[in-house]
Amino acid sequence: MIHKLDSHTHTLASGHAYNTIMEMAKAAVDQKLELLAVTDHAMAMPGTCHSFYFMNLRSLPRSMYGIEVLFGSEVNIMNYDGKLDMSQGLLEQMDVVVASMHTPCLKPGSIEEVTKGYLKAIENPFVNIIGHPDDARYPVDFELVVPAAKEHHVLLELNNSSLKPDSSRKEPLPNDIRMLELCKKYKAQIIVDSDAHNVWEVGG
């Protein structure tokens, strides 16, 4: 089934994004999306918000300008045992959790280490999406990760931001192709997200 949504976006709260929640919601409506998820960076990312921000997300309306809005976080995978930078208590409150590897939070490792880190994150019952697993700085064995994602009902992300010419991620296209081939082989589900950091990227 295909839904028109964007489940990985950032607001001013992330520290290096440029628009408010309401501005992002309005942009999603303009793009004729059915659903928007706001997933600001969790606490280990330099410059992002305090845990209190995520604790208070429950106070926000889940509909803006006629579009459904979910609130969650892009959490950081902090080590190759799958440790995340958000407590279980907070994870339980999130509508959606994207788990990703970022160089400010995790030094790139070997293919064995990275694969283990993703597998451990996939096993976390609060993780819904593995964010941009296409960065060659974090080499991954998709032959192991794709079946695991299917087994645990975790979505693998095709991240539009990775494919932009100015992306900081290394050699994403071959990894995306490999991931998609294996998702087709194993009938695993993917999700296409913008990773928007401003209104012009929403739904892209």
List where the protein language model places each region.
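Histidine-centered catalytic micro-motifs
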Residues: 4-14, 38-41, 130-134, 194-196
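Metal-associated gating/positioning segment near the N- to mid-region
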Residues: 12-47
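Histidine/acidic-residue-rich catalytic or RNA/ligand-binding cores of hydrolases
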Residues: 15-19, 48-49, 139-147, 166-182, ...
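Extended substrate/RNA-proximal surfaces in nucleic-acid metabolism proteins
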Residues: 29, 42, 47-158
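Residue-level detector of anion-binding/catalytic polar loops
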Residues: 34-35, 155, 189
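Short acidic/histidine-rich active-site segments
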Residues: 41, 188-203
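His/Asp/Glu-enriched short active-site or ligand-binding loop at hydrolase and phosphoryl-transfer sites
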Residues: 155-168
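Conserved short secondary-structure transition element at the edge of the structured enzyme core
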Residues: 176-194
